[in-house]
Curated annotation (Swiss-Prot):
The keyword Lyase applies. GO terms for biological process: protoporphyrinogen IX biosynthetic process from glutamate. Keywords: Cytoplasm, Decarboxylase, Lyase, Porphyrin biosynthesis. It comes from Ruegeria pomeroyi (strain ATCC 700808 / DSM 15171 / DSS-3). This is Uroporphyrinogen decarboxylase.
């Protein structure tokens, strides 16, 4: 039977007249229905670990907008929590974790095969979604890349320059490499379990890849992504992988060939014309509208959306933002973006 899900067709290399569309953080605080469900859950982590409510918020933007893909509602920091790190969220400050700064901290982490005990509700969310999503909607699972997750585990929070992680990488490379190896192995198991539960695509979010330069980018962004991708493809032939080395700049060039990912997601620091010439030549790209347009809307949103669609029209393209949609976005601007992509 011919594949009917537009996202999967494009990930297989097909060029469509109208690209499939979804948004990073499409289940989020900009939607009133999300805010109501989150209030019902009590807090963010309780929402992540409640399969029925997590499935509900995943479905909300599909009901409202008819996106071509749903992305599992979860968080990249559930993996360190499953490995034994303490995780909590401070109001107005974002995530906080117990820190990894010495060998003794690392030694307290759980083995990789212990993560499923904590993460089993996430897999149940996937199973619910496979039953409830429309037949034309693809389901995307995801995880954070080892480098990005490590930056939070080392600093205990998000940092503007990932300084603590760079300091450990340079000052105690053996410990840092051991942490990256543990996270790489855990990410393989986590994504594999999502696929076994029903995810049809997986995405690896390397939000802080851009702070790695030269050999460090190769060793800690590119190589772990390649290891994860190769392991998943060996276990689950035919499951596409999207890589997102955010703000990689020139590092986007050749990333798909070097890692084996089926699609490279782009942030909006690179222009569509440049990316079409230098990245899309290797296959599918995803992106890359600035999320600020979801706040401001208007003709600028329409014009930029059309420019991106046109720039990537010669090859496989998934329309998306260059970063997650923000809480102050206007839901009507999301509809305007979708209408522009689908109707021209």
């Amino acid at each position: 039977m011919a594949e009917t899900k537009k996202l999967l067709r494009v990930l297989a290399g097909e060029v469509l007249d109208t690209p499939p569309i979804w948004m990073m953080r499409q289940a989020g605080r900009y939607l009133p229905e999300y805010r109501a469900t989150r209030a019902q859950a009590g807090d963010f982590l309780s929402l992540c670990y409640n399969p029925e409510l997590a499935a509900e918020v995943t479905l909300q933007p599909i009901r409202r907008y008819g996106f071509d893909a749903a992305i599992l509602f979860a968080d990249i920091l559930l993996v360190p929590q499953a490995l034994g790190a303490d995780l909590w969220f401070e109001t107005g400050e974002g995530p906080r974790l117990s820190t990894i700064g010495a060998q003794a901290d690392f030694d307290r982490l759980k083995p990789v095969d212990a993560i499923h005990e904590t993460l089993s509700p996430i897999y149940e969310t996937v199973r619910i979604l496979t039953r409830e999503l429309p037949s034309e909607t693809a389901l995307i699972g995801f995880a954070g890349a080892p480098w990005t997750v490590a930056t939070y585990m080392i600093a205990g929070r998000g940092t503007p320059d990932q300084g603590p992680a760079h300091a450990l990488r340079e000052g105690n490379p053996a410990l840092f490499d051991a942490l990256i190896a543990r996270l790489t192995a855990a990410t393989i198991e986590y994504l594999s379990a999502q696929i076994e539960a029903g995810a049809e695509v997986v995405k690896i979010f390397d939000s802080w890849a851009g702070s790695l330069k030269g050999e460090a980018f190769t060793k800690y962004a590119l190589e772990p992504c390649r290891e994860i991708t190769q392991a998943l493809k060996a276990r689950h032939p035919g499951i596409p992988v999207i890589g997102f080395p955010r703000e990689a700049g020139q590092g986007y060039v050749g990333f798909a060939k070097a890692t084996g990912v089926d699609c490279v997601a782009l942030d909006n620091s690179v222009t569509p014309d440049w990316a079409a010439a230098h990245v899309q030549v290797d296959g599918c790209v995803q992106g890359n509208l600035a999320s600020s347009h979801m706040v401001t809307g208007g003709q600028a949103l329409v014009d930029e959306t059309r420019r991106i669609v046109e720039a990537f029209s010669k090859g496989p393209h998934i329309f998306n933002l260059g970063h997650g949609i923000t809480p102050d976005a206007d839901p009507e601007n999301v509809q305007l973006m979708i209408d522009t992509v689908r109707k021209g």
